[in-house]
Amino acid sequence: YRECFQTLYNQIDQEDSTDSIILVAGDVLHAKTDMSPEMVMLATEFLINLADRAPTFIIAGNHDLNLSNMNRLDSLTPLVNSINHPNLHYLKHSGIYTVGDTDLAVYSILDSNESWPSYKDCESKNKVALYHGPVYGAQTDAKYTISNRHVEVSLFDGFDMVLIGDIHRYQVLQERSPGKPAVVYSSSLIQQNHGETIDNHGSCLWDMQTYSHVFKKLPNNYGYYTLEVKNGKVPVLTDVPKNVRMRIFTGTLDSTGVKKLISVLSSACKQACHGYE
């Protein structure tokens, strides 16, 4: 994580951060309210490094709290309060938050739909909606398409941009057009498991003059890789990270073939954790 985060910091440092802000669309954490000392330290370092570079705004994600018990405190509140950085802002609840010439409209998962804002509540030049959750038509890495119409793209009509977190796959749900905002999932920074692809992880750099963006892929020397052997033939390895956790589907290979395959892979990959079927 630290290696990837440092790469992110380097990417940010290469840009002109004058009059820029950083938006984190939820899921800073992973284990909801189960906070280990290592997690607290790493998350603290991460948020401080972002806030040192530009004003940083965070919204809550489903992994930052226990949605099944709303009486519990979310994990971001004590973390942000403890850091107490003047450039770090937690936009916990739904509402309009004005930053310079931009209104950030937060659709918080902690609040009911009735309390969600509208573009009509915005008074600034730029109108940006922030949401964490599934949106109808979005696709996961497992090729599952969100069919729940609880939140549709049309909900955000009237905004200039909609920045969404939750699904770990970069995707553009809608291009900007008159009355219709650009709606984008920025992806997660880091691949989390074998169910996600190695690529399409990173961040989006937005131009507030044109409401256009560039996806900035975040290189990672660590990752998960699935190798599938079909009819005894091993496919050519592509995009394998230097440090890999490899899952192997051996198909019809016998035990001798499996051992030989693992031996070859172990010498080819710096670090590997093999699990095969």
Give residue spans per PLM region.
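Conserved catalytic scaffold of divalent metal-dependent phosphoesterases
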Residues: D64-S154, A182, S186-S188
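Structural beta-sheet core signal
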Residues: V24, I58, A129, R247-I248
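Accessory, non-catalytic peripheral segments of nucleic-acid enzymes
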Residues: S17, M208-E277
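Short, conserved loop/helix-junction motifs that constitute active-site signature segments
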Residues: I48-D52, K120-E123, V153-G158, R176-G179, ...
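Active-site glycine-centered loops adjacent to acidic/histidine catalytic or metal-binding residues
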Residues: G26-D27, G61-N62, H132, G165-D166, ...
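Conserved beta-sheet core of the metallophosphoesterase superfamily
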Residues: D141-H213
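Conserved acidic residues
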Residues: S20-I22, K125-K127, D160
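Core catalytic region of metal-dependent phosphoesterases/phosphodiesterases
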Residues: Y1-I96, L155
